[in-house]
Amino acid sequence: MKVLITGGAGFIGSHTADRLLKEGYEVRVLDSLQKPIHNSIPEYLDDRIEFIAGSATDIRAITEALQGVDYVYHLAAFQDYLPYFSRFVDVNVASTARIYEIIVRDKLPIKKIIVASSQAALGEGLYLDSRGNEVLPDTRLEENLKKGIFDLTAEDGGELFLAKTPERISNPQNPYGMSKIAEEMFALQLGKRYKIPTVAM
């Protein structure tokens, strides 16, 4: 059995590769080796890994990487705090759509796709204000962060308290989180529609 790991040179990807090798899988890694994170193939990557240098946004690289694999761990992602809004969509959403597009187009017999989401896709979570009212806070204010105020506050500036919550709808507050929830939706819905077993974690 062969596994493709996109973003496999990163921290989570490389540890996933190590575990899969230990379990007896063949591992192929697709990674763009983006600077400043990587300057070359990291020394910590096991020599048994088949490495393809390329981006998850490149249809040719993805097409090559998908050939002959049974499982896909799609871990490649873009995360930054700079306003590269379209890049979040290109890397985190469009690359996921491309993977499904190629699998459907080429009728590849993929047994399962595992997509890495993020806690950022959930948003800040549910809070209670001082009167016990539920509050879904917006983004932390930059002026508060500059003052060293990192806790979320109510609209009136009052204190908020983290609430125990039942399952709730996601409420991401930054471009990274928005792109990761969109990625989850693409993966789960395309997987369901085209009968490609898919998990978003």
Please state what every model-predicted region is:
Residues M1-A200:
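N-terminal Rossmann-like NAD(P)+-binding domain of SDR-like oxidoreductases, especially those catalyzing
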